[in-house]
């Protein structure tokens, strides 16, 4: 997708949030999460009129919304309905059944890759995509407040260009020339569902009804190209709107563990101070880093984009120990 289109989508999303009055809600969720508050009652926000209408607008701006799932419907079919009907149907799908939310089977499609292989893509039904978008909009600011600054994939106001810029900074300015490269093979297909739910809980997302909905999203049946149906016991569905956010939740512990070895080490944090560079205020930890280099601690920095990450070290010894 061209950069111009990507920027346009981001700006459209912001304008939509302002239009439906959700921007202040998102800011409040971020601030509360940053201060360590818990969130036991999020479903009311997720199923609010403004959040549902915002989700519709955000999905409609994506051309993929016109691709049908197993129910053969797309965003155009929802667009023909009055807003009140859409809102009521979303609420009914999520809470109206005695068995709880049950997403329809996800359509599996194999997408060709440049190397001749294929990548599996899941296409949820459009109503389930709308519900995932409603959930994502509320979860994202809560999770963003807890995510590491060194993660760049599938996050608002961050991109692969930011990851590349950080990489060049570590190589050329910090002179960290020993680099370990990692790519977690089959990561999205092997996410442990139970562990993911525990990680969401530890981030403060403690609405049990919401966690039940997320479990159902993860375990949605998959309709294979040959017509058979599979029932996943692990993994996040590639193609699901909420999947990239959940993947970042899973890898957030890795980010913070590596940060704790150097960037967020107590010695660095205790000697940090604020200073102005040009017009921006930054936190300078250089004094702490100087003291830490006199110890046996490993100097290491991570740059992660989804399941692909690099660890940068000062010397070969630290790289081998890492």
PLM feature segments, named:
Residues 65, 77-103:
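Amphipathic alpha-helical blocks
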Residues 79, 125, 311-315:
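Short beta-strand-to-loop capping motifs
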Residues 1-84:
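Non-catalytic, polymerase-adjacent accessory regions of viral genome-replication enzymes
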Residues 22, 52, 83, 87, ...:
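Generic alpha-helical secondary structure
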Residues 105, 149-150, 155, 162-322:
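Conserved polymerase palm-domain catalytic core
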């Amino acid at each position: 997708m061209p950069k111009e289109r990507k920027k346009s989508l981001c700006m459209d999303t912001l304008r939509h949030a302002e239009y439906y009055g959700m921007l202040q809600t998102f800011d409040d969720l971020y601030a509360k999460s940053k201060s360590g508050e818990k969130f036991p009652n999020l479903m009311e926000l997720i199923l609010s009129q403004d959040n549902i209408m915002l989700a519709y607008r955000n999905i409609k701006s994506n051309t993929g919304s016109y691709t049908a799932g197993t129910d053969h419907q797309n965003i155009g079919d929802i667009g023909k309905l009055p807003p009140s009907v859409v809102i009521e149907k979303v609420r009914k799908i999520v809470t109206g059944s005695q068995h709880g939310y049950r997403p329809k089977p996800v359509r599996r499609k194999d997408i060709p890759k440049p190397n001749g292989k294929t990548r599996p893509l899941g296409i949820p039904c459009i109503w389930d995509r709308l519900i995932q978008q409603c959930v994502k909009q509320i979860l994202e600011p809560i999770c963003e407040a807890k995510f590491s600054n060194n993660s760049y994939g599938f996050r608002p106001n961050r991109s692969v260009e930011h990851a590349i810029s950080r990489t060049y900074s570590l190589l050329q300015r910090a002179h960290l020339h020993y680099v370990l490269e990692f790519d977690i093979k089959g990561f999205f297909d092997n996410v442990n569902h139970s562990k993911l739910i525990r990680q969401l809980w530890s981030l403060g997302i403690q609405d049990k009804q919401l966690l039940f909905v997320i479990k159902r999203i993860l375990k949605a049946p998959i309709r294979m190209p040959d017509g058979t149906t599979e029932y996943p016991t692990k993994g996040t569905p590639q193609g699901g709107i909420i999947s990239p956010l959940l993947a970042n939740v899973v890898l957030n512990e890795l980010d913070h563990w590596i940060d704790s070895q150097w960037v967020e080490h107590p010695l660095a944090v205790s000697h940090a101070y604020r200073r102005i560079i040009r017009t921006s205020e930054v936190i300078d930890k250089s004094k702490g880093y100087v003291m830490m280099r006199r110890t046996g601690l490993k100097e290491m920095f991570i740059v992660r984009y989804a399941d692909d990450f690099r660890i940068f070290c000062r010397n070969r010894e630290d790289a081998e120990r890492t």
